[in-house]
Amino acid sequence: LLLGVFGFARPATNGVDAGSKAVVVLAIDVSLSMSAVDVEPSRIEVAKDAALRFVAKAPNNTLIGVVAFDSNARQIIAATDNKAAISRVVTALQPGTGTAIGEAIYAALDTISSAVDPSGDTKNAGTIILLSDGTTTTGRPDTEAAAEAQSLGVKINTIAFGTQDGTVTTPDGQVVPVPPDEQALSNIADVARGKSFTAATAKDLQAI
């Protein structure tokens, strides 16, 4: 599953906490569009399951942080090797509204920075795995944030969830299409020297 992503997610570890531990931040989209059920049982549930599998299979010398984002981005848990605690916060994630991918990247960079030994080399110290379905609707531009990550030597690997047939019902009862913006996520990965994937089905995700 996500260990395919992890295979190229391992950063250089100069200066990170505990010397030999890699730092990976899972940035998980919890916007309303992630509640679409074109990927069964829903985009967000498939993304959460992918994150949980990643956590379970990650090597023990990995510090994992979690950032969740809708119209705001926030660190849900600082980078840690406590897999049970990480799994609890991922399981509890629920969808909101809005999509602030740029803000999520900045929050993930802050999470990496906080896990790095200040006496060491902070360059190339972490990797971000961005699980989302698409387009930034609020906050700072995602390409600007990706460029900041690139300048710090932090790779961003992206996974786009959903199909062109995805829809959601808004709070006022309107059914609106929510196709994934695969190109936007690919652009982020390109700028930050990562790789991008698309998961139109849960089976697709297992092939990553």
Residue ranges and their predicted role:
Residues 1-56:
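An amphipathic, basic-hydrophobic helix/alpha-beta surface used to engage anionic
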Residues 99, 103-106, 118-127, 132-191:
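VWA/integrin I-like adhesion module and closely mimicked acidic/polar interface patches used
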Residues 181-208:
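Extended, hydrophilic extramembrane loops/domains of integral membrane proteins
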